Structures are given as structure tokens and as C-alpha cells.
């Protein structure tokens, strides 16, 4: 994937994800991309994270540029998906793509044989 936008990940999220990925082999493509994202990310302590960046347990408002649909989802660990509506696992292709993005950034992300183009609209 060329021209990837810069991403910022909290050290807390980074540590949680490394621990998760060590034991997850169900979707090797997503796991590989998450490792790549963690390797290229700027990591900061949680208290230094900008408000406009997607982290775990924050609402991400984004647009799928392929179909024009807007979505609001909370990025969570796989074990937290059932805790409420609109929860999105970090191990899903869209969840992996959104992690660390800043408002206004777009990313092309492989998913099930095609490429999704997502643009982050807001974070809450």
C-alpha cells in the first residue's frame, strides 16, 4: 500500500495489540497488516494522544469512499464486540485500517480481495 497516511497509536493500544496478535492466527492478512501498522506508527503515551485520532474505545465517524456511506463505530478488542451496538473489532479489516488515523485522513485498505478507501470524518 503506497502513500499511507501517518498514524499515531497510544503505547497502551500498541502493547494490547502486540499481546493480541501473538495468539491470533484466524485472519493472517489482517494480522500482517496490523503488525505493519504498528511498525510504522508514531507511539505516544495515552495522555498525549490528540483528540482527533482513532484509538481503541473511541467512536470513529468515517466514510466508505466506494459507496459514499457514512458509519459510526467504536473500535474495540475482539472480546468487547458484544458489549454494545456498533462495536468494531480491531481485527476486522476496517478496524485495522482506522486505528491511528487522524480526522481528514484517508486510507486504502485491502479487504476480501478488493481495496476499501476510507476517510475519517470525526472522532469522539
Tell what function each PLM region has.
Residues 42, 82-93:
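Short, structured beta-strand/loop micro-motifs enriched in basic residues and often containing a Trp
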Amino acid at each position: 500500500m503506497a502513500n499511507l497516511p501517518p498514524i499515531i497509536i497510544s503505547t497502551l493500544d500498541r502493547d494490547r495489540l502486540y499481546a493480541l496478535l501473538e495468539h491470533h492466527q484466524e485472519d493472517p492478512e489482517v494480522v500482517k497488516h496490523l503488525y505493519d501498522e504498528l511498525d510504522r506508527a508514531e507511539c505516544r503515551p495515552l495522555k498525549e494522544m490528540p483528540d482527533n485520532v482513532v484509538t481503541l474505545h473511541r467512536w470513529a465517524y468515517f466514510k466508505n469512499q466506494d459507496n459514499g456511506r457514512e458509519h459510526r463505530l467504536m473500535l474495540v478488542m475482539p472480546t468487547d464486540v458484544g458489549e454494545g451496538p456498533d462495536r468494531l473489532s480491531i481485527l476486522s479489516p476496517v478496524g485495522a485500517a482506522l486505528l491511528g488515523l487522524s480526522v481528514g485522513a484517508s486510507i486504502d485498505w485491502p479487504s476480501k480481495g478488493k481495496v476499501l478507501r476510507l476517510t475519517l470524518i470525526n472522532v469522539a
